[in-house]
């Protein structure tokens, strides 16, 4: 078989072997030497990091103020319950976020099937265990389920509104990806006299909310869309330049009252026109000690409170104050 130098082989044999409803092996051959690893690695990374899905992002459990708690009559502690909630395989039809409720009394096992669902919400693994209840135990909770992509830690979803949310609303790190495991191997393939070709075998397992075949299609589509820009390297004729302020940590925009300092320390800071945490961290210890009525005890208190938030005195902020922070805001702080 004669092939032009500029001509590349494309897979002519594609086989999909369904190992189980959630697992499949996809075989593609032949591929030019080296393309097995090139395509296999790219698809694997997309499948693991970029597939959209749904996950529990927040839980509110009756009688629980923080995750380091235990519930009377419940075998698992709160951390174990939150970990079990991460194992739920959920599908949302038509909505990006929904709040679900669960209420059950013991004795017995609490499973995903005990969650009260809306008409457009589906839980694939209804037998998934959430907790075990004793005779005197009960579990009541509200779950916020959201749509997302890949993995997203709870800190990444923090906003100004979250600072004022009620105590007891527990944020979860969310793994939205419906793909549980991906592995690939590259084997030798042969076409007539050519023996230096690749055969790509992808072993893919999902959580049941997405068919393995469909997962491969979506990953390939994402890769195709990203590579399309390289086919024609002509961007917009006139690139749009967007002037943007440097991002400022939201905690620096919060008033010093949020630090919950003693009344004496707080009043001393306001007397020096220090209204925001961003104002405070730019002051040095020497400068603060010159403040009337602010002694070493108050200084130590301020340093400890800042340290608990990963901050310290004497920090430099080149873009402070931001343009969005009006001067008259300080007068009302």
UniProtKB/Swiss-Prot annotation:
Highest taxon of source: Bacteria
Residue ranges of the region described as Alpha C-terminal domain (alpha-CTD): 248-333
UniProt GO BP: DNA-templated transcription
EC number of the protein: 2.7.7.6
CDD domains attached to this UniProt entry: RNAP_alpha_NTD
UniProt keyword Heme present: no
Reaction equations catalysed: RNA(n) + a ribonucleoside 5'-triphosphate = RNA(n+1) + diphosphate
Gene Ontology cellular component annotations, sorted alphabetically: cytoplasm; DNA-directed RNA polymerase complex
Classification via InterPro entries: DNA-dir_RNA_pol_insert, DNA-dir_RNA_pol_RpoA/D/Rpb3, DNA-dir_RpoA, RBP11-like, RNAP_asu_C, RNApol_insert_sf
GO molecular function, one term: DNA-directed RNA polymerase activity
UniProt KW keywords: DNA-directed RNA polymerase, Nucleotidyltransferase, Transcription, Transferase
Start and end residues of each stretch annotated as Alpha N-terminal domain (alpha-NTD): 1-234
Subunit architecture: Homodimer. The RNAP catalytic core consists of 2 alpha, 1 beta, 1 beta' and 1 omega subunit. When a sigma factor is associated with the core the holoenzyme is formed, which can initiate transcription.
Assigned protein family: Belongs to the RNA polymerase alpha chain family.
Domain notes: The N-terminal domain is essential for RNAP assembly and basal transcription, whereas the C-terminal domain is involved in interaction with transcriptional regulators and with upstream promoter elements.
Annotated HAMAP family: RNApol_bact_RpoA
Its job: DNA-dependent RNA polymerase catalyzes the transcription of DNA into RNA using the four ribonucleoside triphosphates as substrates.
Protein name listed in UniProt: DNA-directed RNA polymerase subunit alpha
Origin species: Ectopseudomonas mendocina (strain ymp) (Pseudomonas mendocina)
């Amino acid at each position: 078989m004669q092939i032009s130098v500029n001509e590349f082989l494309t897979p002519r044999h594609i086989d999909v072997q369904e190992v189980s409803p959630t697992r499949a092996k996809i075989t593609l051959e032949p591929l030019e030497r080296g393309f097995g690893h090139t395509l296999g690695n790219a698809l694997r990374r997309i499948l693991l990091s970029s597939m959209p899905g749904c996950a529990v992002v927040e839980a509110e459990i009756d009688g629980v103020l923080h995750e380091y708690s235990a519930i009377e009559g419940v075998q698992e502690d709160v951390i174990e319950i939150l970990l079990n909630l991460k194992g739920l395989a959920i599908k949302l039809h038509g909505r990006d976020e929904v709040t679900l409720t669960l209420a059950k009394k013991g004795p017995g096992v609490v499973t995903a099937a005990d969650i009260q669902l809306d008409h457009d919400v589906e839980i694939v693994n209804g037998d998934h265990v959430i907790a075990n209840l004793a005779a005197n135990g009960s579990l009541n909770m509200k779950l916020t389920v959201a749509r997302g992509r890949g993995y997203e830690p709870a800190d990444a979803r923090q906003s100004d509104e979250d600072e004022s949310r009620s105590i007891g609303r527990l944020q979860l790190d969310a793994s939205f990806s419906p793909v549980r495991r991906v592995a690939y191997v590259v084997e030798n393939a042969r076409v007539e006299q050519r023996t230096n070709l690749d055969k790509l075998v992808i072993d893919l397992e999902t959580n049941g909310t997405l068919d393995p075949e469909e997962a491969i299609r979506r990953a390939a589509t994402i890769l195709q869309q990203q590579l399309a820009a390289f086919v024609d390297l002509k961007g917009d004729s006139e690139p749009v330049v967007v002037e943007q302020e440097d991002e400022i940590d939201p905690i620096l925009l919060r008033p010093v009252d949020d630090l919950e300092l003693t009344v004496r320390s707080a009043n001393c800071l306001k007397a020096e026109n220090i209204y925001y945490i961003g104002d405070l961290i730019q002051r040095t210890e020497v400068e603060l000690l010159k403040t009337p009525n602010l002694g070493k005890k108050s200084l130590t208190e301020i340093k400890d409170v800042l340290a608990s938030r990963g901050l310290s005195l004497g920090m430099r902020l080149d873009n402070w104050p931001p343009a969005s922070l009006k001067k008259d805001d300080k007068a009302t702080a």
